[in-house]
Amino acid sequence: MNLQHHFLIAMPTLQDPLFKRSVVYICEHNADGAMGLIVNKPMENLTVEGILKKLKIAPTAREPDIRLDKPVFSGGPLAEDRGFILHSAQKTFTSSIRVSDNTVITTSRDVLETLGTAEQPDNVLVALGYCAWEKDQLEQELLENAWLTSPANSNILFHTPIAERWREAAKSIGVDIHNIASEAGHA
C-alpha cells in the first residue's frame, strides 16, 4: 500500500492536540516510512506575505491581483523552522519533488521568489514543519483506526475553505465524519 498523494484524515477518536481533526497530505510513502504536511491547521498571525518579509524577499514584478495574505500552515511537529511549499506542477524549482502529476513539493528559496508574481504556480500552500512516520509506523496507526485515507484532491488541498477540509476529505470517500462512532460495539 502506497499512500503518496493521499490524505490522512484523523478519526474523531484521535485526541492528540496536534493531529485532532487534521488532514495530512502524504508527500512520500515508501518502505522506509512516510512524510506529509498537515494542510488544515493555519498558524496564528502568520501569512505568506509575512514569511516573505521575514526572509527579505520582495518580488520585483509584483502582480497586485495575486493575494499574499494567505495563511501559512503548521505542517507538523518536525523541523518547524523549515518551509515546505506544495504547489501545482506547471513549474519546478531547484529543490522540487513531484508528488503526483499535478502536485509538487519544493523546499528551495526560488519558489518563494515567484510568489506574488506572474511566475508563481497557480496553486500554492506554504507550511512550516512536517510530519514523519518511521518504517511500519503509519501502517500500525492505520490498523489502530487512527486515520481514514482518501486519494488526494487538489480542490480540497488548495481551494476548500480551511475549516471544511477535514469534513470534505472524509466526504470525498463517502464518509460523514460526524457520524462515526467512537467505539466499536458488540452484537
From Swiss-Prot:
Look up the record and report any one GO term of the cellular component aspect. cytosol
| Gene3D superfamilies recorded | VC0467-like
- Please give the InterPro entries that the UniProt record associates with this protein: AlgH-like (IPR003774)
What superkingdom does the record give?
Answer: Bacteria
Alphabetized Pfam families for the sequence: DUF179
Q: Give the family per the record.
A: Belongs to the UPF0301 (AlgH) family.
User: Which PANTHER family does the record associate with it?
Assistant: UNCHARACTERIZED PROTEIN YQGE (PTHR30327), UPF0301 PROTEIN YQGE (PTHR30327:SF1)
Q: What is this protein called?
A: UPF0301 protein ETA_28320
Species of origin reads Erwinia tasmaniensis (strain DSM 17950 / CFBP 7177 / CIP 109463 / NCPPB 4357 / Et1/99)
